Design a protein with these regions (language model features):
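Low-complexity "stalk/linker" and mucin-like segments enriched in Ser/Thr/Pro/Ala/Gly
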Residues: 73-88, 158
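Extracellular ectodomain surface segments
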Residues: 37-75
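Low-complexity, acidic Ser/Thr/Pro-rich repeat tracts that form intrinsically disordered stalk/linker regions
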Residues: 24-49, 127, 138-139
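Conserved structural position at the C-terminal beta-strand
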Residues: 108-110
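Extracytoplasmic Gram-positive cell-surface binding/anchoring modules and repeats
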Residues: 127-185
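Extracellular/luminal low-complexity segments enriched in Ser/Thr/Pro
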Residues: 89-99, 106, 166-168
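C-terminal edge beta-strand
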Residues: 113-128
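Sec-dependent N-terminal signal peptides of Gram-positive bacterial secreted proteins and lipoproteins
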Residues: 5-27
Length: 185
């Protein structure tokens, strides 16, 4: 008898809690995610990694929507850097000596004006440990890859005086390629 009474009391308490929570959401406005319109583009989350002081060049990842033309908008700005949009491409530039994690969100809009749900670009900013800073990769899309090669000790380019030069537009010779392959083995 006592067990049955306890079960009924627990069920009654649960019903009261559920009723109050549903009514509170109705009265005070629950946090309901807005759904994109049917046929809206879909923006995908991205993860990027760069080094302190080195811009990262990439393309937004979005598909669908009306027509082929998508435009992109940054909805939430990053805190440790800046984002510049050029068509479907973007450049994230870390500010000053920033390191650590950062993020920003973007949306895609199709030619009919339908907007995607926001997607997050997660950014990791690392400090270069190799001591190599290239004098000729400031605006190059190869800057992060060049720094990756230096950090791994695979290729540091040419050193003239105190400056390192990656020479991103110069073709790699067979002997340089062979040396890089042997270094990774």
């Amino acid at each position: 008898m006592k067990t049955q009474l306890m079960k009924r009391a627990a069920a009654l308490c649960l019903a009261v809690v559920l009723t109050l929570s549903v009514n509170a959401a109705a009265l005070f406005g629950g946090k309901e995610k807005a759904q994109p319109a049917e046929g809206s583009p879909t923006a995908q989350a991205l993860e990027i990694r760069t080094y302190r002081g080195i811009p990262y060049h990439a393309q937004f990842l979005a598909a669908g929507g009306e027509g082929e033309d998508l435009t992109f908008t940054v909805e939430k700005e990053p805190k440790k850097g800046t984002v510049q949009i050029d068509g479907a491409s973007f450049t994230y530039t870390p500010e000053g000596d920033s390191t650590g994690s950062d993020s920003f969100t973007y949306t895609a809009t199709d030619s009919a004006g339908r907007v995607s749900q926001p997607a997050t670009v997660s950014v990791t900013i690392e400090k270069a440990k190799s001591g190599v800073t290239y004098a000729d990769t400031a605006d190059s899309t190869a800057a992060v890859a060049a720094q990756d090669l230096a950090e791994a000790g695979i290729f540091t380019g040419a050193k003239i005086g105190d400056q390192y030069y990656f020479e991103p537009d110069k073709p790699v010779s067979r002997s340089e390629f062979l040396a890089m392959v042997m270094e990774t083995a």
